[in-house]
């Protein structure tokens, strides 16, 4: 984009370094919560995951009548008093005692149910009891589960599957819930192309909107994805203006760092108030937060979400998710955490809170966390990660074997079945990953850090096995000399996993007639 197309006020090359907590606090203090008109009535059976807008009270009791809790006979309990094996009492069926199935209403003037196995039928219409029964025995009294007028759920309660059953049992067919927030996602960038289009040099697939959309749906919002917008100030401004008219929250993806064509902060300043431009986290530093007023003078929250995938996901979870929860008046669910020992020393930049992705597993009864890839653009690092470790801003890193809290990205029971492999990578490991998962339900977690690092990890009991292909130039032998040198007192089993040939690829027909190389 040419500078002449951009207003003089349109570009500001600055980034703050606001601590994460203060950045979020600054935003939440500026925005309010949804008002009463942001609610809707929907069928109770369709309300899974929705948030109650007002308190919910039962319209009927459940059960709304006295019901038999067992198969048997309904009777007035006092008529059975004194019955015993030596002094049995007899009752006429249909006159004194009445046959009932579980759930049937009790006949008038009865207050107990005799279980069918406790009666002796002595005639076609007569039974005998050899024991007495107390009032209301084997009876579900009216309102045993829910009483008419009883508080079922307070306002702000997120409805689960069993909650829907309780609503219907209480006679509630429709329920007032808080409106699901509609969130605009605006991908920006000249280099972006939609999935399925043939790629040219310089093209980048736009997939962040898919990731962001599904995160929003998980959090109960309704994503509205706009078409890709080119790096043009006026075009982006136009789409943002349209989005704040239609949606409750707006996410502009990319256009948030201090580059030449990053316009989000300037657009927010033009349309409203810029609150934060730059947060002291890695990945995710270029995150932007602000408020923009639409034509109805209603302020809408606008985020600039970094373009790198990992940065985008972290900005979403750390800022967008709590903002959505704040707007509809609920708390952000807590994340499951476990204690783990860090597998190796890890440096970090002072002044930045780092979200370190880790692979996890149990080795010798110790839960280990092995640092994974750290780049902001490496989405595979999130795919492969089992958890996140937060390195504080005032820290220059973490020590090996340091105990720390790990926020889990997978269920703990799956992590406990992980097999940790550290060392040299080989494509055949993909086959092993598939086989272990399919046949045994185990997940092979591979940290490709080189053969020597693998041997060190195995020696330090930081892996289940190591991948290595180290050639001894003196003997021409693979691996053994290194194992003996670096693991002299460690008992190991050496498995020849795969044999392979290495070489180079040439163009079809070998036009340059390459025969060897050195």
Task: For each feature predicted by the language model, list its residue ranges.
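Phosphate-binding glycine-rich loops and their immediate beta-loop-alpha structural context
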Residues: 141-252, 417-446
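Short helices/loops that flank or line small-molecule/ion binding pockets
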Residues: 452-464
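Flexible glycine/proline-rich
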Residues: 21-25, 35, 39-45, 49, ...
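Short Gly/Thr/Asp-enriched flexible loops that form oxyanion-binding sites at enzyme active sites
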Residues: 259-271
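Phosphate-interaction motifs
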Residues: 2-174, 338-341, 355, 391, ...
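Beta->alpha turn/N-cap motifs
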Residues: 450-451, 467-473, 480
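A conserved helix-loop-strand patch within extracytoplasmic ligand-binding domains
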Residues: 482-518
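Short, Asp-centered acidic motifs that coordinate Mg2+ and/or phosphate
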Residues: 249, 464-465
């Amino acid at each position: 984009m040419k500078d002449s197309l951009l207003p003089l006020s349109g570009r500001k090359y600055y980034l703050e370094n606001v601590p994460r907590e203060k950045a979020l606090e600054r935003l939440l203090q500026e925005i309010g919560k949804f008002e009463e008109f942001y609610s809707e009535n929907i069928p109770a059976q369709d309300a899974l995951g929705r948030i109650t807008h007002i308190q919910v009270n039962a319209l009927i009791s459940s059960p709304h009548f006295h019901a038999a809790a067992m198969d048997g006979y309904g009777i007035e309990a006092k008529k059975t008093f004194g019955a015993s094996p030596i002094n049995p009492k007899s009752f006429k069926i249909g006159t004194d005692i009445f046959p009932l199935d579980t759930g049937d209403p009790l006949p008038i003037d009865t207050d107990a149910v005799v279980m069918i196995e406790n009666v002796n039928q002595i005639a076609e219409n007569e039974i005998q009891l050899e024991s007495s029964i107390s009032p209301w025995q084997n009876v579900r009294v009216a309102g045993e589960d829910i009483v008419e007028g009883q508080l079922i759920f307070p306002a702000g309660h997120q409805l689960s599957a069993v909650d829907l059953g309780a609503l219907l049992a209480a006679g509630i067919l429709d329920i007032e819930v808080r409106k699901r927030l509609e969130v605009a996602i605006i991908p920006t960038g000249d280099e972006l192309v939609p999935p399925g289009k043939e790629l040219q040099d310089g093209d980048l697939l736009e997939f962040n909107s898919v990731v962001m959309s599904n995160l929003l749906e998980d959090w109960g919002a309704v994503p509205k994805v706009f078409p890709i917008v080119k790096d043009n100030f006026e075009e982006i401004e136009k789409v943002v203006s349209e989005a704040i008219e239609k949606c409750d929250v707006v996410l502009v993806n990319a256009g948030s760092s201090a580059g030449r064509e990053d316009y989000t902060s300037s657009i927010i300043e033009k349309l409203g108030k810029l609150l934060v431009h730059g947060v002291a986290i890695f990945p995710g530093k270029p995150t932007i937060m602000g408020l923009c007023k639409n034509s109805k003078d209603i302020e809408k929250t606008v985020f600039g979400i970094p373009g790198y995938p990992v940065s985008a996901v972290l900005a979403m979870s750390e800022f967008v998710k709590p903002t959505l929860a704040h707007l509809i008046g609920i708390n952000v669910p807590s994340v499951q955490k476990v204690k783990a020992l860090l597998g190796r020393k890890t440096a970090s930049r002072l002044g930045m809170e780092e979200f370190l992705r880790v692979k996890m597993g149990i080795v010798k009864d110790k839960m280990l966390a092995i640092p994974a890839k750290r780049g902001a653009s490496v989405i595979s690092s999130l795919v492969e990660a089992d958890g996140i470790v937060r390195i504080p801003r005032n820290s220059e890193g973490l020590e090996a074997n340091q105990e720390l809290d790990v926020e889990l990205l997978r269920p703990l029971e799956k992590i406990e079945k992980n097999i940790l492999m550290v060392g040299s990578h080989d494509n055949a490991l993909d086959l092993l990953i598939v086989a272990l998962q399919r046949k045994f339900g185990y997940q092979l977690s591979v940290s490709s850090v080189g053969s020597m690092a693998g041997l060190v990890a195995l020696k330090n009991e930081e892996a289940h096995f190591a991948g290595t292909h180290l050639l001894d130039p003196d003997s021409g032998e693979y691996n053994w000399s290194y194992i003996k040198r670096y693991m002299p007192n460690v008992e190991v089993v050496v498995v020849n996993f795969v044999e392979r040939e290495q070489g180079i690829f040439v163009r079809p027909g070998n036009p340059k007639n390459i025969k060897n190389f050195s």
